[in-house]
């Protein structure tokens, strides 16, 4: 089981805080550092010091880390034109020496679009499909060749399709709970399918839909990696679990029901159950980015048991 650190900087985190967490995750042996792509905090609090841009953040981390993979859950398709996104991700991949992964979604949080003057079109899913076709098409076009695309929402003419990523293929993540269109899109474009904040039962059903869609698309169902994103709250004892839950404003029993919470042994057991239904990666949503002892505990007493 591959454990990855997943952060929500819009809730209140500077670049320096994210750098500290990414370096700690790398030093502790985690395989990847991911972040959300949001410009407005959610729920209680003020979100200070304010949002950080996902790909500017990852560009900085690319130069200040050595091994850990870097990515987004998920880049909002509404924030970026597909040609520009292809350039940005390819450049960050070059800057990292080939450690970037792209999670791309349609965008869903209307309030942040209103807050920063970003259009929030009704046809987000149709745009997402064209964005995936364009980004992957640009990267797959040979050097010296031209890329053209004539879609409903985007048109590209005689694009040199540069720059190229350092990797031969940047892994693409697609995720969500949708029962029909999401599995089909994953089958067409994804290297990994991720379902966020889902129960074992719902995860198993959605993985099954994606596997069926992959087969229908002529792919092997096992060609994709299947993963979950779950909030994490681990403590050496009940008091420590309760303290960590309180800091992030959550109830312990709710966290145990909907995430990965409890003692290291309890969390290892629950992760194992996700593994049994086909998940091979867990993105650990870490909400208190100042608590590096939490990461150390997960590394030494959860990750070590799973490895």
What is each stretch, according to the model?
Residues 1-307:
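Active-site-adjacent structural elements that line small-molecule/cofactor binding pockets in enzymes
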């Amino acid at each position: 089981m591959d454990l990855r650190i997943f952060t929500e900087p819009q809730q209140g985190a500077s670049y320096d805080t994210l750098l500290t967490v990414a370096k700690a995750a790398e030093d502790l042996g985690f395989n990847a550092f991911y972040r959300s792509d949001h410009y407005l905090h959610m729920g209680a609090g003020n979100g200070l010091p304010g949002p950080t841009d996902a790909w500017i953040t990852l560009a900085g981390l690319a130069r200040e880390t050595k091994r850990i993979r870097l990515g987004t859950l998920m880049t909002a398709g509404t924030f970026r034109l597909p040609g520009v996104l292809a350039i940005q991700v390819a450049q960050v991949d070059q800057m990292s020496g080939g450690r970037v992964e792209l999670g791309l979604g349609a965008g869903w949080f209307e309030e942040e679009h209103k807050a920063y003057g970003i259009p929030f079109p009704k046809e987000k899913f149709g745009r997402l499909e064209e964005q995936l076709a364009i980004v992957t098409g640009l990267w797959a076009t040979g050097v010296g060749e031209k890329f053209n695309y004539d879609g409903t929402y985007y048109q590209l003419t005689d694009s040199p399709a540069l720059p190229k990523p350092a990797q031969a293929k940047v892994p693409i993540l697609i995720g969500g709970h949708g029962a029909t269109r999401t599995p089909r899109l994953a089958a067409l474009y994804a290297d990994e399918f991720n379902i966020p904040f889902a129960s074992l039962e719902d995860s198993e059903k959605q993985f099954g839909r994606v596997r069926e869609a992959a087969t229908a698309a002529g792919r092997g169902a096992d060609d994709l990696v299947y993963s979950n994103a779950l909030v994490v709250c681990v403590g050496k004892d009940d008091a420590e679990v309760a303290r960590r839950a309180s800091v992030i404003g959550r109830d312990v029993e709710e966290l145990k029901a909907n995430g990965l919470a409890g003692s290291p042994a309890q969390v290892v057991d629950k992760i194992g159950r996700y593994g049994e239904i086909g998940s091979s990666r867990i993105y650990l949503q870490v909400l208190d980015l100042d608590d590096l002892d939490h990461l150390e505990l997960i590394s030494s007493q959860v990750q070590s048991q799973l490895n």
